[in-house]
Amino acid sequence: MNLKKYLLFGGVALGLGMTSCVGDLDLQPNDPNLVDTSDPNFKANALGICYSGIAVSGISGAGSSYVGGLDPGTSAYLRTIFTLSEFPSDELTWIWPNDEGGSIGDLVACTWSSSNTIVYGAYYRLLGHIAICNQFLANTADDTDAETIEMRAEARVLRAYSYYNMIDLFGQSSFITEEAEVGEEPRQASRLEVFNFIEQELKEIVDQKLISENPLYGRVGLDGAEALLARLYLNAEVYSGTPRWADCQARCENIIRRHQGGGFQGSGLANEYLYLFCEDNKQYMPGGSNKAENEILFGISFDQDMVQSYGGPTFIVAATITNTTVIPRQNYGCSAEWSSIKGIQQMAERFYGLSNDKRDDLWVRGVYSDEDYSDTFVGFTGAWGTTGGNVIIKFTGNTITKNPAAVDYSKPLTLFDGAYDANGVWQPNYDATTFMSTDQPIIRLADIYLMYTECYINGGVGGRQQALDYINLIRARAGSPAFNSSELTVKNLMDERSRELYLESVRRTDLIRNKMFVGPQQTVWQIKGNINNMEGTRIDDKYALFPIPNAVLNSQPDFKQNPGY
């Protein structure tokens, strides 16, 4: 069955029988008899919605949403995950802190409350996606053909991803599956219970190979499912109270083994880091054309004509490029420039002294020098707000140059199609658009290599030399010098994860797992505690979890709030 157009456009959501808004927690499965399962395209339509529920905010274009009470773009799935994962961390700030009634500024400063609108949007977005997946699974429960079994496995992985985000962000979770009776209400389940459910689901799918090792483009396959399981085990001590380093490392080894032979130094990694985040990164996706470098193990497809969303890469690109006097937005394939996201001092300092590292090649240096925190990076004050921010570019709407051998990293824009004019000015060869066709990575192979190393450092499992080799593989691809054995430390690992994975929605989780976000070992970062405080203050322990939104507690009086709220 060809799902391509359904994965891109999302199919006909009304065929699922879903309500148009989940703001009232109306998430129980609908009566399957209300769904027209006689439509020959029903399964493709329905599975397409399971995918597009992560990509878009609603079924009627970029301005529609099935989450009420919040701007559709702001409440888009991947955008809410990004916002809650990156803004409270030691990487980013949003320079318009009063946006969304101050909710964004509170996230940056780690001073949010249970009435925060972004937190509300994330909770309901996750539950809405879980409901969509449940609906598909309920309506295909009796089908036993091989194609449907695989489609069901994909929907289960996508649902597991939403439940993973739920326990990562909120701890306890509203919980319901496709086996619930019609009219049955979701109940509140503990973090441990949902952790066990996710583990059971993913282990069955991976170990029984219910999902393809060679999926079609845009669909989740064996690598994506096992990578999500590895990430679950990586954070097991936080989620379940019991570390699972050996289990995480074993899953990493499986994935690494399947990718040996091609790409950078035969590792399966893409040869060029920044190619992973531009418009034709589709070749690195599951089912992508570059089989030797399929580094993106789990990703979400976007298309500027068929998947228009102010979440995902469109949000990241538009928010990170800034005023045209600093970075002409056309140079990055985007017709919008929001001048919103900047890197804070701690993020900038991680690249200090690494002059050959390619991962910051699109960053902008040498402007607004009144807040220059180092010899390399420059902050923004005055008209930019008290942010200490740095212009950090990673995702673009550009396409890869046709001649990779000609890439000149001293002129970052030559990474992409174009040519120098008679005056020596680089002229990009593309039209800037509002919406990006860049796909969004969820888990990459580079993360798997770093997970293996962390399992050794934190759990003492595996070999020291192998752990060192794997982190140095990531550094070699970036152009940074190798660590020696004595440098295999938690601090260096965390800095390397930030350099490699910034803007990929993992930093808050990394900090919590390594006891650096709250508690006695936390580091004090800029802006924390007060959006106008450049020095920052310590973060209260309660902020290791987000609160259950007030709207949920009002509609479900038996639900309990997280401690401290």
Feature map (PLM): residue ranges:
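Long, intrinsically disordered, low-complexity segments
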Residues: 20-22, 27, 40, 126-127, ...
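Membrane-proximal, proline-rich intrinsically disordered regions
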Residues: 21-78, 552-565
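Conserved, well-structured interaction surfaces
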Residues: 40-48, 52-58, 92-170, 185-193, ...
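Flexible, polar/acidic helix-loop-strand segments at domain edges
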Residues: 97-113, 121, 346-444
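Structural register within alpha-helical repeat arrays
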Residues: 159, 229, 236, 445, ...
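Short coil/turn linking the two alpha-helices of tandem helical-hairpin repeats
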Residues: 167-169, 174, 235-241, 458-461
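Extended ligand-binding clefts on enzyme/binding-domain cores
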Residues: 263-400
